[in-house]
Amino acid sequence: MPQVKKIVFSKKAAYRLGKIADYIYEQSRSEDLTLAYMGRLQEYMSDVLLRFPEAGRKADEYGKNIRKLVYQGYSILYRINDAKQRIEITNIFRENLP
């Protein structure tokens, strides 16, 4: 597998990141807390996916070649694009587990 050099977000994933930030701000009313959490989320994605692109489990129920990584209750759906040497985040959403 070629080395993955960057992470890109689909429009849907970028929108969902914004909604997650909005939700955290609504709950905390703290811009600092929101920025810190979003920074940790993005740092986690970068640290894990750039070093270990296959860290997520295969999640074909979401589409062909999709993998799923979970961070603090948020599912991160992505695919590995070997030709472009990148990770493509397709969606991020909250797992509402019982």
Which ranges hold each PLM region?
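Basic, Lys/Arg-enriched alpha-helical interface segments
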Residues: M1-G63
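Enriched for short, Lys/Arg-rich terminal
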Residues: S28, R67-P98
